Amino acid sequence: VICTGATLPRDLPIEGRNFKGVHFAMEYLTATTKSLLGEGADSCPISAKDKDVVVIGGGDTGTDCVGSSIRQGCKSVVQLEIMPKLPMDRAADNPWPEWPKVYKMDYGQEEAAAKFGDDPRVYQTTVKKFVADATGAVKELVTVQIKWEKNDKGQFIPVEQAGTEKTIPAQLVLLAMGFLGPEQPLIKAFSVDTDPRSNIKADHGKFNTNVKGVFTAGDCRRGQSLVVWAINEGRG
């Protein structure tokens, strides 16, 4: 039974990506959890204590990064979101019983607002480059605002807005921009089929792959999701 998750993170290949202090979100969250379960928070190899933290990405993983940074005693935290801020009320094309696409604050943002006085999210913003200090560690990043516009094919694409560049201090940058699917070496080793999103192909409820005797469940089958879905499929 293959239950390896969908841990391949989306990267940000821009200038300065390899500076010290720029990490994938799961590197940070995993290290934080292991330190808390082991020797304690002070032993964490990636710590937000007394640092300006920038979280890039607005999903559940980004929220966890915001909350963990605050609990470690960060100096400040900013969460960059490439999408626009959602409306306070449902739009006409988002009726019940559809999932409400409205503005909300999750626990991470609420903790940030309680400590620093405001929602840490900055919307319709992307990162141009990272800037390092003399030791090669990240010290700040340069952002630019974007606007979503339709191209010739009718697809919405992000367009940078001239004159909106801004520098934000950051000694710790956490990349929480989603996941691209499960790690591929093990999948290839078992010769199982994958779907267009590179997840292992198997029907929900049966979980059998194209290879006899090989089954799969959880995020490596359905794609990156919440742990409750993995628990549900494990019980199934």
Give the role of each language-model region.
Residues L12-G16, V66-S68, P185-A189, V228-W229:
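Short amphipathic alpha-helical segments
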Residues G58, E81-K85, A132, D219:
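Cofactor-binding loop segments of dinucleotide-utilizing enzymes, especially the Rossmann-like FAD-
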Residues N18-D50, E149-Q224:
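FAD-site-proximal beta/loop scaffold in flavoenzymes
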